[in-house]
């Protein structure tokens, strides 16, 4: 529908999975970072299928070594800026707090869309804002097209390198029930496509789609949605020809 031809204009390859240690989170984070260090020795833009949102931290670490600080378009029900989670400094709910602390993000070029989780307080979102993030809570997205918002996003993130991170729980569980931390009142599938298509023209240096959980996805609809959104992300990568 967008006339994008990613397979006709890019060299696209599935390079397989990263063999993590499922019993040691910190070791897995190390393994992922080392794998992406090797991947990024080549002229590639990695588009990654998670896994939970922990994976984004080691990927951003590797990307920082090549591109420096990056802007971020982050779609999620949760801000993922906890200082600790289950007593741990590194977990799926702490990713972007650690990324800020480690200097991986250009904070004035970060946008978070769809935040709404019941477990958060206003202060949690305010922490993001004090860092320079543009925070778009879910209720700001209800009953409307997000095309105007994405014009603001493109202006915010500008011409520098940008990473796109899409947590499937940013979408309402009516469409994406197969995830570990579903939250009502989320984005629609159409809005998700508007967000991704609105990233066309950005200097995307990587992206991921995370938190699809097949054991919770009894109908397969969430996996289908995730696969389609990954394809939408592929269609907005730099170098894709539109015919």
Regions found by a protein language model. Give the residues of each.
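Class I SAM-dependent methyltransferase core
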Residues: 48, 74
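Catalytic cores of soluble, metal-dependent hydrolases
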Residues: 1-47, 54-69, 126-130, 134-243
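Conserved donor-binding loop and adjoining core beta-sheet/short helix segment
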Residues: 106
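Active-site glycine-rich loop that binds ribose-phosphate moieties when present
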Residues: 31, 55-58, 72, 79-83, ...
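Short acidic donor-binding/metal-coordinating loop in glycosyltransferase active sites
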Residues: 51, 77
């Amino acid at each position: 529908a967008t006339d994008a031809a990613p397979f006709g204009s890019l060299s696209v390859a599935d390079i397989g999975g990263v063999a993590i240690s499922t019993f040691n989170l910190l070791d897995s984070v190390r393994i992922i970072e080392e794998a992406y260090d090797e991947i990024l020795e080549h002229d590639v833009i990695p588009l990654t299928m998670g896994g939970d949102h922990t994976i984004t931290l080691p990927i951003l670490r590797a990307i920082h070594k090549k591109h420096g600080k990056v802007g971020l378009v982050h779609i999620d029900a949760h801000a993922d800026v906890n200082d600790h989670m289950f007593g741990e400094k590194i977990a799926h709910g702490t990713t972007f707090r650690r990324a800020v602390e480690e200097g991986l993000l250009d904070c004035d070029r970060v946008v978070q869309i769809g935040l709404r989780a019941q477990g958060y307080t206003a202060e949690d979102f305010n922490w993001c804002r004090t860092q320079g993030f543009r925070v778009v809570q879910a209720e700001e997205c209800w009953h409307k097209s997000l095309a105007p918002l994405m014009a603001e996003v493109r202006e915010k993130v500008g011409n520098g390198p940008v990473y796109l991170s899409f947590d499937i729980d940013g979408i309402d569980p009516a469409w994406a029930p197969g995830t570990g931390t579903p939250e009502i009142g989320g984005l629609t599938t159409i809005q998700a496509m508007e967000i991704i298509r609105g990233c066309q023209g950005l200097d995307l240096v990587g992206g991921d789609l995370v938190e699809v959980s097949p054991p919770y996805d009894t109908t397969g609809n969430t996996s289908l949605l995730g696969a389609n959104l990954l394809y939408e992300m592929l269609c907005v990568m730099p170098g894709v020809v539109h015919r």
